[in-house]
Amino acid sequence: MQLPRFQEEDGETLFVIEYDDAATAGLGTLNDLRVIADRVDARRIRLEITESAAMRDPEYTVDVLSSVRSLGYTVILDDFGTGYSSMAWLHRLPAQILKIDRTFVRDLATDADSRRIVEVMVSLARDLGLATTAEGIETDEQSRILAEIGCDYGQGFLLGRPVPASELVAGLRTTS
């Protein structure tokens, strides 16, 4: 496991564990997450599940994600706006961050409807006490508009590309 090693290298890096199936994030995974929480500060780890995966079995998802939160992990609802969740489920899911799908970010600078949809998503999240992350940021203009709208976090090639763990460790060493 490389997470404790990353924690030694850099005390600020956040890690994301992605699940595209609520069943995958079930009881076996909860046991794994308990072990990880004993070795790494769980507040530095985000567990991300897609909206469509969460809606396959919403009651089960609520139970699993509530357990995950009780371990100290932050829960992210990914690809928001692309699945089939109702506002009732959005209210019940124990997520702390709403991740706005790249399909809404892509045309943000050129399409008034895309911008308005993102504004409403950010406003809704804020009203529910959730932070927001926009994914798929590829231009300075998208980044500027999202900051103007009040989106809390961003993700995309403009901000950084995914790297293998070995490169991340090497990069942490050279910047410390």
Describe the residue ranges of each PLM region.
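Catalytic-core regions built around general acid/base machinery
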Residues: N31-R39, D63-L71, V120
